[in-house]
From Swiss-Prot:
Biological processes, Gene Ontology terms: translation
Bias type Basic residues, positions: 9-22
Domain of life: Bacteria
Record HAMAP family: Ribosomal_uS11
Protein name in the entry: Small ribosomal subunit protein uS11
Entry GO terms, CC: ribonucleoprotein complex; ribosome
Record family assignment: Belongs to the universal ribosomal protein uS11 family.
Quaternary structure (record): Part of the 30S ribosomal subunit. Interacts with proteins S7 and S18. Binds to IF-3.
Length: 134
């Protein structure tokens, strides 16, 4: 009786195809604890992303401007492999890595077309949580 299991059936591994996108959007979400950079095509499909935690920072070091710089560089390099050359930047959040992430996108060779602040602000909507007493 032959042993159970697969017999000579090789598993097919699908390679990730390279999209050729020259222009896209860079979404930078900068919170007090982390910075997330997502680079998308104009219709919103994510081409590359990186965050301060994904790059290798842990704990309170994720919230530093240097961590935001490294995350933006990592996302930009991967987007350039897909042919990205120009981005429009959308910045969201109050964190410390906002300007540093934009500067590092420019430094890696991506041409920054426009910069927009899309931080959501309430028109006096929900009641905020009570103040912290430390």
């Amino acid at each position: 009786m032959p042993p159970k299991g697969r017999q000579g059936a090789a598993k097919k591994v699908r390679r990730k195809e390279k999209k050729n996108v020259a222009h896209g959007h860079a979404h930078i979400k900068s919170t007090f604890n982390n910075t997330i950079v997502s680079i998308t095509d104009p219709s919103g499909n994510v081409i590359s992303w990186a965050s301060a935690g994904h790059v290798g920072f842990k704990g309170s070091r994720k919230s530093t401007p240097f961590a935001a710089q490294m995350a933006a560089e990592s996302a930009a390099r991967r987007a350039q492999e897909h042919g990205m050359r120009k981005v429009d930047v959308f910045v969201k959040g109050p964190g410390s890595g906002r300007e540093t992430a934009i500067r590092s996108l420019q430094a890696t060779g991506l041409e920054v077309g426009s910069i927009q602040d899309v931080t959501p602000t309430p028109h006096n909507g929900c009641r905020p949580p009570k103040r912290r007493r430390v």
